Amino acid sequence: MNTIRYYLIKQILIEENELVQIKDILSYEQPTKYLVTKTEYSSDDSLIPVLTANKAFVLGYTDEKFGVYDKGECIIFDDFTMDMKFIDFPFKVKSSAIKILTAKKGFNLKFIFEYLSFLGLSSIDHKRHYISEIEQMKIRMPNDYKQNQVANFLSSIEKKIKIESEIYILLIRQKQYLLSNLFI
């Protein structure tokens, strides 16, 4: 996936595309009203997920029905680590260091997420980065048709990878079951 993303974004960089600042294509929202109040999380995945932008991603689940982000697609961006995740389901967050990013009219959020992922943003300083650095960055944006093409293509690959990963896990389980019954 990274190789394909790299190739597609490299193509966009060499083409004559509009140079825009991040602040002109993304809006951000502070997560204050979506913060979880309980720190005891459930493992019941039928509840509301509590998210973080880092590797843990889903910290657990909560039964809190208030303050749930349910406005549709967004990117959660950790202001300290610059980790980010593309989200398309209702959630709550644990940390006030998260920025909730949404695309402005005429821009494809999934495309922007893939572009920012391509850039490999990372932090060595423990400070807030979004307003002071990320919003000021300039990136090359193709027209909305091309944005949608790239976003849809990468999304279809992600779906295929997810399906194949699930099949792989099922095959491993089947193998373990067969091996356990082989020597009975």
Q: Where in the sequence are the language-model features?
A:
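Amphipathic alpha-helical coiled-coil/heptad-repeat segments
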Residues: 1-19, 140-184
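Short, solvent-exposed loop/turn elements at domain surfaces
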Residues: 59-61
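Short, surface-exposed loop/turn microsegments at beta-strand edges and helix-strand junctions
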Residues: 39-50, 63-95, 116, 128-132
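Basic, amphipathic alpha-helical recognition segments used for DNA target recognition
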Residues: 82-144
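Pocket-edge structural micro-motifs
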Residues: 52-55, 77-79, 102-103
